[in-house]
Amino acid sequence: MHYVLLCSHSAEVCPRSNQKTRDMVLKLFPEMPSIAERTGVDIVAGPYVNQEHTMVAVVESDRAESLDRFLVEARFGQWNTVRILPSLPAEEGMK
């Protein structure tokens, strides 16, 4: 199953303006591929960031529990509100 992750945060905790968050993000982002592999998640695209205080990623996992473990270990919830959209490829979703 594919999941679109929409992670939004306030300007106050944005890594561009908050040193504590920046330090955490700079430490964790290089570890993201190994966290994903360890938790059974495949990062399909992203994470992408933008000026709207939103981070977007597309991941794939056979188990929702694996995705939850990935999000906890990657600490996305410590500085974001995470919205998870279970998604299908368009061809499959149109059936």
Give the residues covered by each predicted segment.
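Short S/T/G/P-rich N-terminal loop/turn motif that feeds into the first structured element of a domain
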Residues: 1-53, 62-66, 87-95
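Glycine-centered loop/turn motif at secondary-structure junctions
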Residues: 40, 75-78
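Conserved RNP beta-strands of RNA recognition motif
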Residues: 57-59
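Short amphipathic alpha-helices in soluble, non-transmembrane regions
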Residues: 66-75
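Conserved short beta-strand edge segments in small beta-sheet-based binding/regulatory domains
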Residues: 77-89
